[in-house]
């Protein structure tokens, strides 16, 4: 169940508690150019007891990899091991327009970020030298005083699940290779295999055997109503399409 991210967080928390009592097993919070998802997820962790809580999604450009790892570990701790880190590249309209940073190397950045996060959760002394991220920062790019560090706290879990929101063939292939789960959008079950079957198969062929089977979280809309209301409810789907095409697309 995707929880309301554009309204009152307290109302969303009350709704989440009601949904939990009704049997919903996972609640997702989005982050666009809205309230940040982390504050809401932390509040939800205090107001729920059993349902999993996931970010859907935290953009990879809005936080450093280590901050993303720290945030996920903190949310997993306060929720007693119920957090799912959902990440994604978002799009240039939001990343460059709202966050003011270049939208470059989205798939490569995503892979590096996950690698760094998993090092942090294992409490390794974190070093990384990639195309996008360098830990510690090289001396010629800063003061030269940076040192390799490890997380002070002991995480609730060293294997916090990471889900990726992806659509393009290469991104879906990487998702199937390295992520715990996949968050597609506008998912049509009858057409999924013809669109994504090959990249999923290619990614799974390279998947580390230590990873669990990839979960798929495909959103959908459900409304219980009479026929008179059905047409109006169907029209509400136009809003989400317009948001993705006009408000976030490029």
Where are these regions (language model features)?
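Active-site-adjacent structural elements that line small-molecule/cofactor binding pockets in enzymes
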Residues: 1-250
